Amino acid sequence: MSARHFLSLLDFTTDELLGVIRHGIELKDLRKRGVLFEPLKNRVLGMIFEKSSTRTRVSFEAGMIQLGGQAIFLSPRDTQLGRGEPIGDSAIVLSSMVDVVMIRTHAHSTLTEFAAKSRVPVINGLSDESHPCQLLADMQTFVEHRGSIQGKTVTWIGDGFNMCNSYIEAARQFDFQLRIACPEGYEPDQRFMALGGDRVQIIRDAREAVRDAHLVVTDVWTSMGQEEETARRLAHFAPYQVTRELLDLAAPDVLFMHCLPAHRGEEISQDLLDDPRSVAWDEAENRLHAQKALLEFLVEPAYHHA
């Protein structure tokens, strides 16, 4: 049996995604009650980082330990990935020593090349194309607070980059309407827009985009690797700051999410994370629980069919 990978939300069926989310909620409850649950005892997660991280590293490392396993952190200084050794060769060797691999990288092609040669599951911890693990946490957070997201309206405000791409995939997989509010020149790649079909639309006016929305989401205006564009981006995105007043135009039960870290005074107002409609802290914690469910889903079948 070949290994299952999680490089994008499209790698799982809708039922599988919903099952992972439900199990993430169960694992969260077990942890809060102090119940020991170690289905991945003696399993090892290899974590390859080409980009710095706080939430991704801590959530995966802590999650694997809580499931009874262990995690190995590999920084660019620790590996030959893409430096002298072909990615496929690294995948063959590393996947013979660990039970699952998580990669946080720049080029999405690194993930696909690694997965093609890996004998164990590979997880996308973030690439320049998508961030599916964050979407698992976001969808779990919405389900916990509001129930099913099917048929709801979600507004993405900001850059049409990797997080936005994953929201387009989520609109397809979870069947919700997605409005994208962004300046001209910052739209998502046409491949993703085509994927979203009639579930996705671009609206230039942020106020119009949030009207009656059930979920409003944003992210930083300048991602890692784009620092030289900061001044230009600040000018272009200024009309897209999410404030309490903007949320007032959304549905009465609207939720606000941000994958963090947040730049207060830029993409959000200084006080927005303190607004009762913000669930950003729950969202951040749910990275731990959703990814534990994902690890169990991927590693246990791979182990039993080995």
Curated annotation (Swiss-Prot):
Function in brief: Reversibly catalyzes the transfer of the carbamoyl group from carbamoyl phosphate (CP) to the N(epsilon) atom of ornithine (ORN) to produce L-citrulline.
Major localization listed first in the record, in broad terms: cytoplasm
Organism ancestry = Bacteria, Pseudomonadati, Pseudomonadota, Gammaproteobacteria, Pseudomonadales
What's a single GO CC term here? cytoplasm
Its protein name is Ornithine carbamoyltransferase
* Localisation: Cytoplasm
Question: Gene3D superfamilies of this UniProt entry?
Answer: Aspartate/ornithine carbamoyltransferase
Q: Which PROSITE patterns match?
A: CARBAMOYLTRANSFERASE
